């Protein structure tokens, strides 16, 4: 008979099945997750300062740091863990106001997330706040519904997008009402002002194709530039405002989701159009083969218009995502960032003669900051190196300071600034002296061998106080994505910052933890990312998890009968794959919002996906799913899911629990009403991780005869 255990049952069980006592110095998960997490660093257009958003125990605020002291100062005063995240900060042209987005976008039913069940509901909106408020009236004011604020580079206008339409308002007029700039078909994105702030470029997505549009603000005249049957995106203005460059991906059948795509039938291209005449021409096109697919990076635009009339862009010609540049007049592309490693984030310096970026060249399981010349006239120079992790660099408008985020194995993410030739230093106020740094462990890089022979990178966390001869329970963590990579330290993404904290906490509770960078993730090149038969085309990455399990089983410090799995999203998929196909190896698992049937997972993103029209693909997709092998699933599992998940449908967990109950598998569950995929509330992360740890303690910490703990 089946047995489904609710959290009330869990709490009762804990009273009689508490784990072995732990040292009082062990860190608490609330403290680990409560450390401020900074994100979205932007440089002021004047004065040499920076701004960013930080979340501390779920409370979101906007911060600034200005020279010469560069001490952090909050410019908003939100106080609640209410799930209303801040994002997309941008400076006004005079550097005196910050605009930002508050809240998350609506789901298909038109409802914005409300995980705190606020009585009046929620709505995503664009807000503005002065960086030096003089009165309470000058605290953040709401400009209107929407997101993606784009202040003009001159004057006081700001534009943004609401439900695919462009809106605009004058920041200098406190009583001004926002107005829709133009009524246009399609869904607008990638807003970009002309240098003189008279026109606004954007991409218009029409579903099957997309255009580049330009609106003259004063007259509201709308024109589409070089329209075609293809997909145009990423418009960027020339420095003199006379031309726009953009990327063109040529019309082709929609590529399969969660399937390898190493090449495109028609390689992507860069085109330039004269805004006045409409004359357009192709200035560069990718070669056939590797790099023919446009693979993006974290940047304000995939094409950056640099000094010397050169265009900077990402290209995977070598099998690694690198930066290249080409003259706007056309010609061959020049590689700017050679070597084995991937560029992940890039921005131009204020003089546009250089690009500052982060990459994993020479240190594949970390990130460091580099600078390269736009013309490729010299080798890139490393700004940071060593055992730290540094990312998202941006240079001050003055050119005298570079700010970036930094962490290491023990020190959580914080803001750092480097001025002149001085070593980088933490920005005052972005690190807590109370954080339990000394009680964390340093993960060790290890290589494991998948069951098909593929070498796989992983990080091993050993519990403190592990003695020779002891055999501890062990856990494998699988990240989500799958386009992700776990690092040898605190992660640069919030979701995986939390996962790293969880792995540290589990190690402090006595577990050997192995974090696996399975195939189809990033950081190791195109062939690894676009792995043969991964995802819906065969689930080949499951072989990496099996190899990791066998690696742990072979270790003298691991009890082979007490190996578990945990992960979220794609990691939840791999957790479920392990339990459904190898319950003899994996004794228990915690599955956060996992994909359990690829056909359902694809339909979440493509509602028009029809398994009856794509029968062969759909059959293979199901065979690559946990539900296809649920008959051999015997190990207990904890399912955790928010019911407003827009990435992995809540029905995925409903279908799985139904199948497991029919087969008598022990299932526990934790559900968060109105919560999304990447939990918006700190309290929900804490509760979920506590439930996961309690589950593993009860399932894996009981001592089998002859074993030691």
What are these regions (language model features)?
Residues 50, 98, 158, 200, ...:
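Hydrophobic beta-strand positions that form the internal "hydrophobic ladder"
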Residues 382, 389-709:
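Serine-hydrolase catalytic core recognition
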Residues 53-63, 78-85, 101-127, 141-148, ...:
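A flexible loop/linker signature enriched in serine peptidases of the S9 family
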Residues 66-70, 130-135, 171-174, 216-220, ...:
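Short loop/turn segments that connect beta-strands within beta-propeller blades
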Residues 45-46, 93-94, 153-154, 195-196, ...:
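Residue-level detector of Asp-centered blade-edge/turn motifs that repeat once per structural unit
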Residues 24-38, 72, 140:
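A short helix->beta-strand "capping" segment at the edge of beta-propeller domains
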Residues 30-61:
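Beta-strand-rich domains and repeat architectures in extracellular enzymes and scaffolds
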């Amino acid at each position: 008979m089946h047995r489904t255990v609710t959290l009330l049952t869990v709490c009762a069980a804990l009273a009689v099945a508490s784990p072995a006592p732990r040292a009082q110095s062990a860190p608490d998960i609330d403290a680990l997750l409560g450390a401020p997490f900074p994100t979205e660093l932007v440089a002021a257009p004047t004065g040499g300062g920076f701004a960013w958003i930080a979340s501390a125990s779920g409370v979101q605020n906007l911060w600034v740091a200005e020279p010469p002291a560069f001490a952090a100062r909050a410019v908003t005063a939100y106080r609640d863990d209410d799930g209303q995240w801040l994002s997309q900060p941008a400076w006004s042209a005079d550097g005196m106001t910050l605009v930002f987005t508050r809240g998350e976008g609506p789901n298909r039913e038109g409802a914005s997330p409300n995980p705190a069940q606020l009585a009046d509901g929620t709505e995503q909106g664009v807000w503005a706040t002065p960086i030096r408020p003089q009165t309470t009236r000058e605290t953040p004011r709401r400009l209107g519904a929407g997101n993606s604020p784009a202040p003009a580079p001159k004057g006081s206008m700001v534009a943004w997008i609401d439900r695919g339409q462009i809106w605009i308002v004058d920041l200098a007029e406190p009583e001004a009402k926002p107005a829709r700039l133009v009524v246009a078909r399609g869904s607008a994105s990638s807003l970009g002002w002309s240098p003189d702030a008279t026109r606004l470029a954007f991409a218009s997505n029409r579903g099957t194709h997309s255009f580049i549009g330009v609106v003259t603000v004063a007259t509201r005249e709308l024109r589409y530039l070089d329209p075609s049957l293809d997909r145009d995106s990423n418009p960027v203005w020339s420095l003199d405002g006379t031309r726009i460059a953009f990327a063109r991906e040529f019309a082709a059948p929609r590529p399969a989701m969660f399937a390898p795509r190493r090449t495109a039938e028609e390689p992507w291209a860069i085109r330039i159009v004269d805004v006045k005449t409409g004359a357009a021409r192709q200035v560069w096109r990718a070669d056939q083969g590797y790099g023919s697919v446009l693979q993006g990076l974290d940047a304000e635009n995939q094409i950056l218009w640099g000094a010397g009339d050169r265009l900077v862009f990402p290209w995977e010609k070598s099998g690694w995502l690198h930066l290249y540049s080409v003259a706007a007049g056309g010609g061959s592309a020049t590689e700017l960032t050679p070597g084995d490693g991937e560029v992940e984030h890039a921005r131009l310096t204020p003089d546009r003669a250089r690009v500052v970026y982060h990459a994993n060249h020479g240190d594949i399981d970390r990130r460091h900051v580099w600078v390269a010349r736009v013309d490729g006239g010299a080798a890139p120079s490393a700004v940071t190196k060593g055992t730290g992790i540094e990312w998202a660099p941006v240079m001050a408008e003055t050119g005298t300071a570079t700010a970036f985020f930094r962490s290491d194995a023990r020190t959580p993410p914080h803001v750092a600034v480097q001025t002149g030739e001085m070593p980088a230093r933490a920005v005052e106020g972005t690190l807590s002296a109370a954080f339990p740094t000394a009680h964390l462990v340093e993960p060790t890089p290890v290589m494991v061998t998948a069951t098909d022979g593929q070498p796989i990178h992983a990080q091993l966390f050993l519990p403190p106080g592990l003695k020779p001869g002891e055999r501890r329970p062990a856990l494998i963590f699988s990240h989500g994505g799958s386009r992700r990579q776990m690092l040898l330290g605190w992660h640069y993404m919030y979701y995986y910052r939390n996962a790293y904290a969880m792995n540290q906490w589990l190690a402090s509770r006595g577990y050997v933890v192995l974090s696996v960078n399975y195939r189809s993730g990033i950081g190791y090149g195109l062939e690894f990312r676009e792995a043969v038969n991964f995802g819906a085309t065969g689930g080949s990455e499951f072989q990496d998890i099996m190899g990791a399990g066998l690696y742990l089983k072979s270790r003298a410090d691991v009890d082979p009968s007490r190996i578990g799995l945990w992960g979220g999203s794609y990691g939840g998929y791999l957790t479920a794959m392990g339990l459904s196909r190898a319950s003899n190896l994996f004794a228990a698992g915690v599955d956060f919002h996992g994909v359990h049937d690829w056909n359902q997972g694809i339909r979440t993103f493509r509602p028009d996906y029809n398994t009856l029209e794509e029968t062969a693909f759909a059959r293979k997709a199901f065979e690559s799913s946990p539900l296809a092998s649920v008959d051999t699933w015997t190990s207990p599992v904890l399912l955790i899911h928010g019911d407003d998940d827009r990435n992995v449908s809540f029905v995925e967990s409903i279908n799985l629990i139904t199948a497991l109950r029919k087969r008598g598998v022990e299932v526990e569950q934790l559900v968060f009403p109105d919560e999304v995929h990447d939990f918006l509330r700190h309290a929900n992360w804490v509760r979920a991780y506590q439930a996961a740890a309690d589950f593993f303690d009860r399932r894996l910490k009981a001592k089998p005869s002859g074993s030691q703990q």
